[in-house]
């Protein structure tokens, strides 16, 4: 059964990284269909309101809409050509663009859920925590708002096709393993590693032990 993935893109190197990674992982994860999606820029609220009253403003709004749509289609065609150059069949690539309605992250998630996609792929900007607070991040917002749609975040210079799954026995961890099983079913050419970090006593105990006391308890097997 084909797996459906949506790659949310803009005109940035981070999106280029996501497209390149998706094409590369296709070598080992077979039967994948891709949809390249671009959410168009926000249109001025003033222009939207004026367009309801003024024919001139309405004409200007139509002009802006056409420009945004043309720019989006050119961008998507460029990424489509890149994926085809990396070995993806043209029939396995669909294009989708739409005006921004709910917000960039929510529009991406709404589209992915409505289309029953198996995952969303995005390039990650790699902002620090402080930068993320002030500037925001589409990838961070997608992760924060998703409930059922798996999200793949791609960093720069991501070349490995092997997969590592960090597990801790939680429900979300089991969901990640379930998603991995779905995506890798019947593929024997991929290496999967499961990684678990054993917690220390201080990670979950509210008592403020001295470091020597903690070490002594851990040596006795209380960790």
Segment roles from a protein language model:
Residues 1, 41-44, 70, 77-120:
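Structural beta-alpha unit
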Residues 36, 92-97, 153, 194:
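A structural preference for short, hydrophobic beta-strand core positions in alpha/beta folds
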Residues 13, 70-73, 99-103, 133, ...:
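Conserved phosphate-coordination/catalytic loops
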Residues 1-61, 88, 161-222:
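Small/aliphatic-rich secondary-structure junction motif
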Residues 51-58, 62-86:
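Conserved N-terminal ligand/cofactor-binding loop architecture of enzyme catalytic domains
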Residues 3-4, 14-15, 21, 27-29, ...:
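Gly/Ser-rich helix-loop-strand patches that form or flank binding pockets
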Residues 96, 123, 166:
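Conserved residues at the C-terminal ends of beta-strands
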Residues 21, 71-79, 107, 179, ...:
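Short, solvent-exposed amphipathic alpha-helices that sit
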């Amino acid at each position: 059964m084909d797996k459906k993935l949506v790659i949310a893109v803009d005109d940035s190197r981070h999106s280029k990284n996501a497209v390149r990674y998706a094409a590369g992982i296709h070598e080992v994860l077979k039967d994948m269909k891709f949809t390249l999606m671009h959410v168009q820029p926000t249109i001025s609220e003033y222009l939207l309101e004026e367009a309801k009253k003024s024919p001139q403003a309405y004409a200007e709004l139509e002009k802006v809409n056409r420009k945004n749509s043309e720019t989006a289609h050119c961008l998507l065609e460029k990424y489509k050509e890149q994926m085809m150059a990396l070995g993806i069949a043209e029939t396995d690539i669909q294009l989708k663009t739409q005006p921004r309605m709910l917000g960039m992250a929510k529009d991406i998630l709404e589209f992915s859920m409505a289309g029953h996609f198996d995952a969303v792929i995005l390039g990650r900007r790699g902002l620090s925590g402080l930068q993320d607070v002030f500037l925001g991040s589409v990838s961070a917002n997608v992760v924060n708002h998703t409930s059922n749609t798996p999200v793949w975040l791609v960093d720069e210079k991501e070349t490995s096709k092997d997969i590592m799954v960090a597990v801790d026995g939680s429900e979300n961890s089991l969901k990640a393993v379930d998603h991995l099983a779905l995506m890798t079913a019947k593929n024997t050419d991929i290496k999967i590693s499961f990684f678990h970090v054993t917690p220390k006593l201080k990670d979950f105990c509210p008592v403020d032990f001295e470091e020597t006391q903690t070490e002594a308890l851990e040596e006795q097997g209380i960790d």
